[in-house]
Amino acid sequence: MKARELKELRSSNPQDLTVKLGDLKAELFNLRFQLATGQLENPMRIREVKKSIAQIKTILREDEMRALEQ
């Protein structure tokens, strides 16, 4: 993800992030299935999706910690 996209994610609400996280997990499942069957055209997409999942989880956790501090 680009820095601009990360800023947009940080400004969005947790419900939107949770939906996006679910979509990315489903995409990762499909990519892994394609990899196993030999139909995957772009193996780097798996890495990109995993990184995006980690970034969204980090943003959600930061929001949780910020809420606990208040």
From Swiss-Prot:
Keyword set for this entry? Ribonucleoprotein, Ribosomal protein
GO CC term, one of those recorded:
cytosolic large ribosomal subunit
Gene3D superfamilies per the UniProt record, alphabetical: 1.10.287.310
What biological processes does GO assign it? Answer: translation
What one GO molecular function would you report for this record?
structural constituent of ribosome
Superkingdom of this protein's organism:
Bacteria
Q: Tell me the InterPro entries matching this sequence.
A: Ribosomal_protein_uL29, Ribosomal_uL29, Ribosomal_uL29_CS, Ribosomal_uL29_sf
NCBIfam families from the xrefs?
L29
**HAMAP family attached here?**
Ribosomal_uL29 (MF_00374)
Belongs to which family?
A: Belongs to the universal ribosomal protein uL29 family.
The name of this protein is Large ribosomal subunit protein uL29
